């Protein structure tokens, strides 16, 4: 079941404010998601084998941030009807009546187009086209096509959130390779455990909005089993940079420890057999997943700077 697109956002929200605030527009950008996008893109750009002019590097990261923000605004524009239904999202600017759908759409389109044009004009067109494809994938493939149709929405659509380190890499090198693809795979495999653990303690919200998340469609047991499965795949991918010699021993040790802890949480979630235990472990798994991804990419960055210092 999905909420009809014809459903007026105003039907469950306040009247549109005459003057949206700067904060309202910032909220449209999904700033917390943008931080993750910017950080992983920055790591991809810095650890690539080619040094980029700092000014062009700054422009590249700015374009990725602006493009990600534009995509976030377009996502909120399209999902305004279901955002109005969900407790977690009904205070967003459009369902709350702070910004009109039309303004949000124009805002998102302008940011998305500008980010691609500036990236292409000042950095390189390969990275710009990669950025354009990522925005398209997030809005059209994930938001419009998959999100309301299949419980695999997160698995396939998660690619959009995994592309930023490859875009950062492409901004510096003008191409992509196996190392950048490994960075993509880490985030791609991380996405299902992250979002499905969230959906386990937010299933009523998703059910009310008619979004076919895994717990609502396949059930709690299947969801927990798949969280464990994808966590193991993610751990294997996280070991990849060390295995191929892209990352050193420092990364290898710490990424292994972090992956074991993540698998431990996912295993305990899978074995939980009461409602309270499931909710508790789902929350622990979700919040650890946030730390895990930041730590994995942070370790890569720290190790890179340590090696630079040693070489100098």
Curated annotation (Swiss-Prot):
Regarding protein family, the annotation reads:
Belongs to the UbiA prenyltransferase family. Protoheme IX farnesyltransferase subfamily.
EC class (word) = transferase
Q: Which taxonomic lineage is given here? A: Bacteria, Pseudomonadati, Pseudomonadota, Alphaproteobacteria, Hyphomicrobiales
The record, for InterPro entries, names: Protohaem_IX_farnesylTrfase, UbiA_prenyltransferase, UbiA_prenylTrfase_CS, UbiA_sf
Q: Which Pfam families match?
A: UbiA (PF01040)
Gene from which the chain derives: ctaB
Q: What does this protein do?
A: Converts heme B (protoheme IX) to heme O by substitution of the vinyl group on carbon 2 of heme B porphyrin ring with a hydroxyethyl farnesyl side group.
Keywords from UniProt, A to Z, are: Cell inner membrane, Cell membrane, Heme biosynthesis, Membrane, Transferase, Transmembrane, Transmembrane helix
Q: How does it sit in the membrane?
A: Multi-pass membrane protein
- Here the disulfide bonds are none
Q: Which reaction does it catalyse?
A: heme b + (2E,6E)-farnesyl diphosphate + H2O = Fe(II)-heme o + diphosphate
Segments spanning the bilayer are 33-53, 54-74, 105-125, 126-146, 154-174, 181-201, 243-263, 291-311
Question: Mind telling me what this protein is named?
Answer: Protoheme IX farnesyltransferase
* Broad class of where this protein is predominantly found: membrane
């Amino acid at each position: 079941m999905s909420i009809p697109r014809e459903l007026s956002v105003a039907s469950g929200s306040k009247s549109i404010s005459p003057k949206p605030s700067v904060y309202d527009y910032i909220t449209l950008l999904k700033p917390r998601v943008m931080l993750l996008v910017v950080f992983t893109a920055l790591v991809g750009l810095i650890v690539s084998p080619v040094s980029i002019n700092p000014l062009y590097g700054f422009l590249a990261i700015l374009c990725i941030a602006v493009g990600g923000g534009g995509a976030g605004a377009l996502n909120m524009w399209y999902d305004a009807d279901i955002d109005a239904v969900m407790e977690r999202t009904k205070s967003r600017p459009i369902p709350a009546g702070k910004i009109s759908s039309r303004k949000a759409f124009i805002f998102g389109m302008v940011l998305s187009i500008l980010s691609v044009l500036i990236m292409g004009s000042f950095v390189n067109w390969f990275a710009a086209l990669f950025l354009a494809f990522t925005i398209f994938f997030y809005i059209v493939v994930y938001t419009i096509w998959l999100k309301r149709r299949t419980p695999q929405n997160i698995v396939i659509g998660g690619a959009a959130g995994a592309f930023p380190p490859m875009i950062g890499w492409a901004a510096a090198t003008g191409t992509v390779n196996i190392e950048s693809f490994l960075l993509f795979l880490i985030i791609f495999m991380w996405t299902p455990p992250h979002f499905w653990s969230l959906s386990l303690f937010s299933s009523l919200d998703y059910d009310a909005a008619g979004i076919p998340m895994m717990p609502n469609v396949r059930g709690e047991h299947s969801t927990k089993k798949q969280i464990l499965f994808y966590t193991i795949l993610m751990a294997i991918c996280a070991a990849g940079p060390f295995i191929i010699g892209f990352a050193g021993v420092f990364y290898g040790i710490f990424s292994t420890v972090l992956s074991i802890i993540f698998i431990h949480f996912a295993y305990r979630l899978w074995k939980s057999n009461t409602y309270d235990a499931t909710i508790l472990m789902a929350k622990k798994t979700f919040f650890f997943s946030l730390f895990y991804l930041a730590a994995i990419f942070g370790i890569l960055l720290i190790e890179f700077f340590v090696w630079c210092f040693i070489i100098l």
